[in-house]
Amino acid sequence: LLISTRFLRKVAINRRNYFRKRKENNKFRGIIMKNYEINSRTLAIVPVGENLTNVLEEDNEFMINMNSMKIIEKSCEFFGSSYMGRRTGTKVLTGISHKSPIIIEESTNMIYFPTTSPRLIGCIWIALDKIKEYKEVNGKILVFFKNRRKIFINISYGSFDNQYLRATKLEYILRSRKKLEN
């Protein structure tokens, strides 16, 4: 992967601006954590450059010194599986093989979906069950979470809607299987 100097400068400037905004808004207090496992309060995993991630929770916001894909992988492992195992499970259940939604934890239907290819540095992961609604605003998506938090995502409406529907399909299949078991 060839990364230009211009791109790296842009990432550094974005990081500085990001931290400045967070300090002004008083949501981010400057603490950077080394590890994080996705939990029932996690709303979104938002990368800030290559090895730094902003995690939005219902009541908190954390900076993690780890890329977003690593957080997803570690969270899958924390709940007893690997990312590749979860991805294969999604493919078997739904037939989806690219930009797959992932079941982080099955008993509580903790499902996350990527906004782009998970291999890309800028891939954001969103918790399906935390979304209240989403709409297009000036070519971007504004996601409203159930707890009234919101986030802008630089993605087309069609692409976001497709990812949301894929995750919903996975959730429906999981719920249907659980009903058959009972």
Set out the residue ranges of the language-model regions.
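Eukaryotic intrinsically disordered, low-complexity regulatory linkers and tails enriched in Ser/Thr/Pro
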Residues: 3-126, 132-182
